[in-house]
Design a protein with these regions (language model features):
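Nucleotide-activated chemistry modules centered on ATP-dependent adenylation/adenylyltransferase
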Residues: 1-191
Length: 191
């Protein structure tokens, strides 16, 4: 419902950036509202920081779908920010409370991952001189492998389309979900 129409529209930000993060927010908000309705909740919450676009995406979608629901945004609460002024404090809290998270002080980046997209963010990753092939960054390859670990041979793939939507990979008819999973596996193993 979201990915294929976005691809058909050629929706790419600044001519190069897939909308993998931004397209997910309305879908997440839609599902949050559905769950809130099912459980007769009066509010929904998101963890978007108060400085990015995600908060706007979540809240506009929620307002359109369920204007009666309160939206709780902890990162806009001063007491919350005083308790957790940065990643270190949040990671320390999670460790103390035995809350499993992938971030650590050695790997202090955040990850956004969904069926279409994966991205990482942290101050050190914004450095254009960063050597992302260094062994310490190998853990960032979640959907793919380092180019050094990818096969040296190309793999030929056929895609079948119907009404602009991919319906088969290598001759095997699949649901949209299975198509995306198959393409992620094929692309991922080639780095």
């Amino acid at each position: 419902d979201f990915i294929f129409p976005m691809m058909q529209a050629g929706a790419i930000y600044e001519g190069q950036y897939f909308l993998g993060t931004s397209i997910a927010r309305p879908l997440i908000a839609k599902r949050m509202v559905e769950i809130a309705r099912k459980h007769r909740a009066q509010a929904i919450a998101h963890g978007a920081t108060g400085k990015g676009n995600d908060q706007v995406r979540f809240e506009l979608a929620a307002a359109a779908l369920a204007p009666d629901l309160e939206v709780i945004a902890p990162w806009r609460d001063e007491d919350f920010r005083n308790q957790f002024p940065g990643r270190k404090e949040m990671i320390d809290y999670c460790v103390a409370k035995k809350i499993p998270v992938e971030a650590s002080m050695k790997k202090p980046y955040s990850m956004d991952r969904n069926l279409l997209h994966i991205s990482f963010e942290a101050g050190m990753l914004e450095d254009p001189w960063l050597d992302a092939s260094a062994p310490r960054y190998k853990g960032m390859y979640k959907l793919s492998v380092s180019p050094e670990d990818a096969p040296n041979r190309p793999e030929h793939v056929t895609l079948d389309f119907e009404k602009g939507n991919c319906i088969a990979v290598n001759g095997k008819v699949m649901s949209p979900l299975k198509v995306m999973q198959a393409l992620n596996r094929l692309g991922g193993k080639h780095g």
